[in-house]
Swiss-Prot record:
Protein encoded by which gene: clpp-1
A GO molecular-function descriptor: serine-type endopeptidase activity
Protein name: ATP-dependent Clp protease proteolytic subunit 1, mitochondrial
Keyword list, A-Z: Hydrolase, Mitochondrion, Protease, Serine protease, Transit peptide
Presence of keyword Hydrolase: yes
Length: 221
């Protein structure tokens, strides 16, 4: 049942890949197996090695595909680590929390890596990885801030929406507190406005546990 569900979700993911392939050119790889050669799109091939990628804004469609992949890998093994690579500007809070809850629910440890940027909900998913397995590449950028949103309609509707955003803000602050070890007051103050961080600043803040070094020489931060 789960395998059929994941297959359908991955098919949807492939449909999404096809729609952007004309713009970005998603590569295909040939895998030499014992029974012959098989062709995979690169993301499906990486999935075999328990690697998943969040390389877009966070929305419900991306969340559904990523959650399906996490559940599939959990069904394969609840002990082997899953590696999540993040390069995302953030996006929907509820979609991001759906991914977050899945990471926390499964028993397979999830290592997180930021390459490029992990902003907004992307930074929350970065710090949600298994403690000791959260990494940043040297030139990555991380940004945290409070949730934002708009409202229209009657005065009562606007008040209801504002109260919901306030509740989400409080919950996101609590999640950052849990994963960074910072105090609630420190988190609330930091997230009051956009706060951009280098990899080293994110390490000091508690969003990541280590910075992956380049094999070659590079300028210091």
């Amino acid at each position: 049942m789960l395998r059929r569900l994941v297959t359908s979700s991955l098919s949807a993911s492939r449909s999404m890949s096809a729609s952007v392939q004309s713009r970005v050119g998603i590569p295909f790889v040939i895998d030499n197996e014992g029974k012959g050669e098989r062709t995979y799109d690169i993301y499906s091939r990486l999935l075999r090695d328990r690697i998943v990628c969040l390389m877009t804004p966070v929305d419900d469609f991306i969340a559904s595909a990523l959650i399906a992949q996490l559940l599939f890998l959990q069904s394969e093994s609840g002990k082997k680590p899953i590696h999540m690579y993040i390069n995302s500007p953030g996006g929907s809070v509820t979609a991001g929390l759906a991914i977050y809850d899945t990471i926390q629910m499964i028993s397979a440890p999830v290592s997180t890596w930021v390459i490029g940027q992990a902003s907004s909900m992307g930074s929350l998913l970065l710090c949600a990885g298994e403690k000791g397995m959260r990494s940043a590449l040297p030139n990555s950028r991380i940004m945290v801030h409070q949730p934002s949103g708009g409202a229209q309609g009657t005065c009562s509707d606007i008040v209801i929406r504002a109260e919901e955003i306030t509740r989400l803000k409080r919950r996101l602050n609590e999640i950052y507190v849990h994963h960074t070890g910072m105090s609630y007051d420190e988190i609330e103050k930091t997230l009051d406005r956009d706060r951009f961080m280098s990899a080293h600043e994110a390490l000091k803040f508690g969003l990541v546990d280590q910075i992956e070094t380049h094999n070659g020489s590079m300028p210091s931060d």
